[in-house]
Amino acid sequence: MKIWNKIPIKDNGDKLIAIPSCLKLLDPHPYFHLGAPYEDKTSIWKLREEVINRLVKVNDYLISKSSFNLLIYDSWRPLEVQEFMFKRAFLLECEKSDIDISFENIKSYPSILKKVEKFWAYPSNDNWCPPPHSTGGALDVCLSDKDGNLIEMGSMVDQMDETSNPYFYANIKNEEAIIWNSRRNLLREIMTKFGFAQHPNEWWHFSLSLIHI
């Protein structure tokens, strides 16, 4: 059991609302583009109201301190979308290993399941241990230029390997690594300044919580 599953959950009643136009969104949405089962395009970009309030402050502060903008890569995920993406990640990992398997036999390959769960929360419908993105309190963010173009951070969002660790480039001293590490540090420092916690395995994933969810 992951440590956050031991923490009692209490819904604070914060509304799930559309993300305002003052925040930059990745277009097209990466999972909708893959066929993830969102109800419609209006249901893609949503977060809890307090999360949005703090993101606006993050973006304003980021712009005042750098040449970057905050770019939201992904936000709230309906459970059906979480299931779609989890299955896709698992089956792609099986394909890389030349394993022909149906998702129903997922437990037959615990090493692959363990790797996937390091980056993708299992699509549990248990209200006491929901996937973080399905609560509306977690999101994936990047840095962009003023036109919304992604800034290189040293790995792609959702890249399931060690380069996605927030501190992977901290002790690598070539020119590119130093730049990527400084950008990751900037993103983390500003997000945490406004109350967000960073996922220990993903430089892009943050949640408004006292723990990493």
Where does each model-flagged region fall?
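Conserved metal-phosphate-binding beta-hairpin within the catalytic cores
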Residues: 206
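Conserved small/polar residues in nucleotide/adenosyl-binding loops
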Residues: 211-213
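Extracytoplasmic cell-surface/polysaccharide-interacting catalytic and binding patches
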Residues: 1-75, 79-200
